[in-house]
């Protein structure tokens, strides 16, 4: 080979070696970079997994730690051996599978635990009830047993704390028999008692309570209830009513709470009633609400206090008007009202005719309140309570349509004197509606309506709310309201206000929250106020020792006996737990023993003779019996209670079902002030209408007699022919 060929071969070998060395260097560099990338990727995934698995269980966390330790050990082995090992990273799918397995294990463990606890569900419910009871107890003890400092600032007697109740003698209470004008009650105290009355119209709707009782009830179901007819009507009548709705604007609306009021069709938003589809649309209401003037209030107070000086009464009226607004309901169209009232009077009093009365409210006067209430009572006695509720709601609608826009029932914003006839109809409609609500099971709504009824005249209390309000609040488990009210002057100013039922309701409320000492003190206070009734209750309901009740006979005390009968009619519904009845029996035995030892004193004037009560000319008593107790007893329609009413009450007084024991004039001047049904009847027109009805009846009797004679004659002829 030539030298040139040798040099070329050497250059080629050198080039080959250089290329080989470069390739090896690149391999080493790429291997290092790959290992670094793998290490970096592993760190990123571990960070992501730490964030994602932070909410997982501790078992999963331990598993991930073990994986990391195994990976670290593998890296150490690789470095020690010098031989690369393949690193396998956990993928997302594998981790999800691990999580699903862990969750399945956890669910299975939870299901097994639930099965084990299935037998202890009743115990858990009892513990939950105990927690609720403890919460109520702490809440009541925090707010319910505080004194009303505002009333004490007025220098007015208020009920003491339960611990001091035993030191308060009954004679510290005043009597309404000698104070018919409530002059000893500072009217400014009502400002601090507004919490005991109603200021939320939503609570007056039964649907509010239905939503609380059945949380899964749908708005569509409630809408269907609102769209239902309140009384049975034919499809033809419904079509006619729908045509009338198109002619009268603002009738019903989407929420069934709009009603036109006046010739301008101005819409009135209803507060506590809803328009039903079978109610006949009208352009304006039947009643209006009038604010009473100072002269009206003076006439009213002169009726209540016929023996007081007029100047003193005027001063009291001016003080009242600073805090309270007084109203009266009156007919918008007096002529139309007199016509409807005459038809009603003839169909109810002169010539009782149920069919004529039903026809009166069905076609001629569909919004005549006395007729609606009377027909509702007829349906109740016939057992048709479904139609009763619709008629009562229609009667309340008449008053709801007439209410002022800013009215609330807090005892200050709206009071209705009982001497006015249509005011009394509003009282009666609410009372009947409360009974209907209680029968339907909405006790909470019934208790709210009781607040409304009481707020219309909290001092006079014409229908005796103090005799039955405890019943609804106990059934509604509202113990805080009862305990707070027991410290209010509304229950403690006059002895007639601290009723037997409410006194025992305070005892029962303390028992329900396990305040035994307070319950004992409340029972001792009740015995000092009502010794005769509690002694009789001890014998009849608790089957106590008769020897302990000697010298405490209720015989001859009509008022105390009537109040006791009214309470005993509902005693089993309230005292329905054996431990509570046992407590009442044992504590009454102890109190009666202390009474006979002389350690307990009662008022020496208890059950005094009221023969001279008429000399005081009190409009709130009849022979010593509170007139509101009599009204409540009659309206309750409990046979055992009505049997305890003295017979002279029925014979010597006006007891109409639509107007029970209406107020009677106390002087010549008050004859024109006190309204009754005859106030809205024209005597001449009534005489003419009565004569026409008598002629019609005579004619019908003659027709019946002729028909009967003809029938007899035909039967005689047929018998002769057969013979």
Swiss-Prot record:
Polar residues composition-biased segments: 27-37
Subcellular locations according to the entry: Cytoplasm
Residues recorded as bearing Phosphothreonine in the entry: 158
Location, primary (coarse class): cytoplasm
Pfam families to which the protein is assigned, alphabetical: Tcf25
Domain of life, per lineage: Eukaryota
Molecular functions (GO terms): molecular adaptor activity; protein-macromolecule adaptor activity
Bias (Basic residues) ranges: 93-108
Residue intervals passing through the bilayer: none
Annotated Gene Ontology cellular component terms: cytoplasm; RQC complex
Biased composition (Basic and acidic residues): 109-118
Keywords annotated in UniProt: Cytoplasm, Phosphoprotein
Modified residues annotated as Phosphoserine in this record: 119, 160
Gene Ontology BP term (one): ribosome-associated ubiquitin-dependent protein catabolic process
Keyword Phosphoprotein: yes
Region (Disordered): 21-125
Record text on subunit structure and interactions: Component of the ribosome quality control complex (RQC), composed of the E3 ubiquitin ligase RKR1/LTN1, RQC1 and RQC2, as well as CDC48 and its ubiquitin-binding cofactors. RQC forms a stable complex with 60S ribosomal subunits.
Record-stated family: Belongs to the TCF25 family.
Function in brief: Component of the ribosome quality control complex (RQC), a ribosome-associated complex that mediates ubiquitination and extraction of incompletely synthesized nascent chains for proteasomal degradation. Within the RQC complex, RQC1 is essential for the recruitment of CDC48 to incompletely synthesized nascent polypeptides that are ubiquitinated by RKR1/LTN1.
Other information: Present with 339 molecules/cell in log phase SD medium.
Name this protein carries in UniProt: Ribosome quality control complex subunit 1
Species of provenance: Saccharomyces cerevisiae (strain ATCC 204508 / S288c)
Gene behind this protein: RQC1
């Amino acid at each position: 080979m030539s030298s040139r060929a040798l040099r070329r071969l050497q250059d080629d070998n050198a080039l080959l070696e250089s290329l080989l060395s470069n390739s090896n260097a690149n391999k080493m560099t790429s291997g290092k970079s790959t290992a670094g990338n793998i290490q970096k990727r592993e760190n990123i995934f571990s960070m992501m997994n730490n964030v994602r698995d932070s909410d997982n269980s501790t078992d999963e966390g331990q598993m991930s730690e073990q994986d990391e330790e195994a990976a670290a050990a593998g890296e150490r082995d690789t470095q020690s051996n010098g031989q690369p090992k393949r690193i396998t990273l956990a993928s997302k799918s594998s981790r999800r599978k691990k999580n699903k397995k862990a969750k399945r294990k956890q669910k299975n463990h939870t299901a097994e635990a639930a099965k084990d606890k299935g037998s202890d569900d009743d115990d858990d419910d009892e513990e939950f009830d105990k927690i609720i009871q403890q919460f109520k107890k702490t809440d009541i003890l925090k707010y319910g047993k505080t004194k009303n400092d505002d009333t004490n600032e007025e220098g007015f007697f208020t009920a003491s704390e339960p611990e001091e109740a035993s030191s308060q003698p009954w004679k510290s209470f005043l009597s309404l028999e000698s104070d018919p004008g409530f002059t000893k009650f500072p009217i400014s105290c009502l400002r601090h008692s507004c919490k005991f009355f109603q200021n939320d119209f939503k609570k007056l709707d039964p649907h509010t309570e239905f939503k609380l009782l059945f949380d899964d009830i749908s708005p569509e179901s409630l809408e269907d209830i609102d769209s239902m007819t309140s009384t049975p009507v034919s499809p033809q009548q419904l079509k006619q009513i729908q045509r009338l709705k198109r002619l009268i604007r603002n009738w019903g609306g989407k929420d069934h709470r709009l009603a036109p009021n006046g010739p301008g069709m101005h819409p009135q938003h209803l507060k506590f009633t809803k328009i039903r589809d079978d109610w006949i649309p009208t352009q304006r209401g039947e009643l209006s609400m009038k604010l009473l003037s100072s002269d009206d209030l003076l006439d009213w107070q002169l009726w209540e206090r016929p023996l007081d000086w007029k100047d003193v009464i005027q001063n009291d009226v001016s003080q009242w008007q600073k805090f309270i607004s007084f109203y009266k309901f009156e007919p918008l169209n007096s002529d139309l009202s007199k016509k409807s009232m005459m038809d009603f009077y003839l169909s109810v009093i002169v010539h009782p005719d149920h069919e004529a009365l039903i026809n009166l409210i069905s076609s001629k006067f569909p919004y005549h309140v006395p007729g609606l209430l009377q027909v509702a009572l007829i349906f109740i006695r016939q057992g048709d309570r479904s139609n009763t509720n619709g008629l009562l709601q229609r009667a309340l609608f008449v008053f709801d349509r007439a209410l002022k826009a800013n009215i609330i029932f807090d005892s200050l914003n709206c009071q209705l004197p009982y001497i006015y006839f249509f005011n009394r109809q509003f009282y009666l409609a609410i009372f009947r509606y409360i009974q209907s609500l209680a029968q339907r099971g909405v006790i909470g709504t019934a208790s709210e309506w009781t607040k409304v009824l009481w707020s219309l005249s909290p001092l006079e209390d014409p229908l005796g709310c103090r005799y039955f309000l405890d019943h609804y609040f106990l059934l509604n488990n509202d113990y805080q309201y009862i305990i707070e009210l027991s410290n209010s002057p509304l229950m403690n100013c006059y002895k007639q206000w601290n009723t037997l039922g409410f006194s025992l309701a305070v005892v029962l409320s303390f028992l329900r929250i396990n305040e035994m000492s307070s319950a004992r003190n409340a029972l001792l206070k009740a015995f000092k106020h009502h010794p005769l009734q509690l002694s009789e209750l001890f014998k009849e309901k608790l089957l106590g020792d008769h020897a302990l009740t000697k010298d405490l006979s209720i015989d001859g005390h009509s008022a105390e006996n009537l109040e006791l009968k009214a309470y005993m009619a509902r005693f089993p519904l309230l005292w329905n737990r054996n431990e509570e009845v046992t407590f009442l029996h044992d504590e009454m035995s102890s109190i009666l023993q202390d009474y006979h030892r002389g350690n307990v004193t009662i008022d020496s004037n208890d059950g005094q003779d009221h023969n001279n009560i008429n000399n005081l000319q009190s409009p709130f008593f009849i022979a010593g019996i509170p007139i509101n107790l009599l009204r409540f007893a009659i309206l309750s329609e409990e046979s055992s209670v009505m049997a305890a009413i003295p017979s002279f009450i029925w014979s010597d007084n006006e007891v109409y079902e639509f107007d029970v024991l209406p107020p009677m004039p106390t002087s010549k001047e008050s004859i024109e002030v006190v309204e009754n049904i005859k106030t809205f009847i024209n005597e001449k027109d009534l005489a003419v209408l009565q004569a026409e009805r008598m002629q019609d009846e005579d004619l019908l009797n003659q027709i019946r007699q002729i028909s009967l004679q003809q029938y007899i004659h035909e039967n005689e002829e047929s018998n002769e022919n057969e013979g």
